[in-house]
């Protein structure tokens, strides 16, 4: 056994990290987030990439056995460890505490069922649990059958419009409440703030240069009678894990509580179950339970009070 480390580099390490996270994915035992979680954030326009170079990989020979990384905010730290290499956990925790972002003492460890040994180490280092929640999944042994309401239709993948999608996401994620209306989306923006221009630029880049493991052909977009986008549900299909990884999901305010999100999830179910999918991700909102979502992965947030 020859353990070495290196700092993450997007150009060379993206595929090894994806393969590693796919290989150790365990729906039953847990052990952390699925592979799309990291790549989706890394290629997003909403994540601060300034500290990606602090992400670190552990290798046994040429085989990835551990990975520490951040997401958004940059002070949220995640761990992935290959089974059999749990002995690296203390070293990985110490590295995270010493080298990864901890601005204003806000560093948090985002841990999961199957990572109880990491929780014990974190507690010894002065971390305490702040909250926890169940990130629910839908088991495809059950049927999902929520039809599209009258007056709405699915948009063909080839017809997807990045500007309409940017507008849908702006209002669907309630950015208008604190950042104003969706305007000036073509303006040059160097403010560093989340603006319509930044949002539109990010989605346009996704259309032109999608992340390498993305499967945008399975994205679901729902439009109203005026061809305005009302609901958007992204999809990363991971056949090796039989996983339909749904991210993100939003509905514009004027069309909420009409069953659009449920219809979008049903469309994913109908497309991907024949391909071999056995389960689909969702979230912690109670609305998922109402349409049949059940046990998924359990999040535990740990932080220190200095």
For the regions a language model picked out, list residue spans one by one.
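Short amphipathic alpha-helix that is part of the acyltransferase structural core
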Residues: 1-40, 147-198
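Conserved donor-binding loop and adjoining core beta-sheet/short helix segment
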Residues: 6-14, 24-100, 224-225, 230-247, ...
């Amino acid at each position: 056994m020859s353990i070495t480390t290196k700092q993450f580099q997007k150009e060379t390490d993206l595929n090894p990290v994806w393969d590693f996270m796919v290989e150790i994915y365990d729906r039953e035992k847990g052990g952390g987030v699925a592979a799309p979680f990291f790549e989706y954030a890394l290629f997003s326009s909403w994540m601060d990439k300034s500290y990606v170079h602090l992400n670190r990989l552990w290798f046994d020979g040429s085989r990835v056995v551990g990975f520490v990384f951040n997401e958004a905010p940059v002070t949220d730290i995640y761990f992935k460890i290959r089974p059999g290499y749990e002995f690296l956990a203390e070293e990985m925790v110490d590295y995270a505490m010493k080298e990864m972002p901890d601005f204003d003492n806000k560093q948090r460890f985002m841990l999961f069922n199957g990572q109880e040994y990491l929780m014990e180490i974190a507690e010894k280092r002065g971390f305490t649990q702040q909250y926890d929640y169940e990130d629910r999944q839908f088991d495809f042994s059950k049927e999902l059958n929520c039809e599209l309401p009258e007056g709405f239709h699915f948009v063909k993948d080839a017809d997807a419009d990045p500007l309409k999608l940017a507008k849908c996401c702006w209002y669907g994620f309630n950015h208008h409440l604190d950042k104003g209306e969706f305007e000036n989306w073509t303006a040059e923006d160097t403010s560093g703030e989340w603006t319509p221009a930044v949002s539109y630029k990010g989605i346009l880049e996704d259309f032109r240069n999608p992340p390498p493991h993305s499967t945008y052909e399975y994205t679901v977009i729902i439009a109203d009678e005026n061809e305005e986008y009302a609901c958007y549900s992204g999809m990363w299909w991971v056949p090796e894990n039989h996983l339909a990884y749904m991210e993100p999901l939003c509905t514009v305010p004027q069309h909420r509580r009409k069953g659009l999100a449920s219809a979008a999830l049903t469309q994913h179910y109908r497309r991907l179950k024949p391909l071999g999918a056995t389960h689909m991700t969702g979230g912690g909102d109670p609305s998922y339970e109402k349409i049949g979502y059940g046990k998924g992965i359990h999040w535990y947030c740990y932080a220190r009070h200095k």
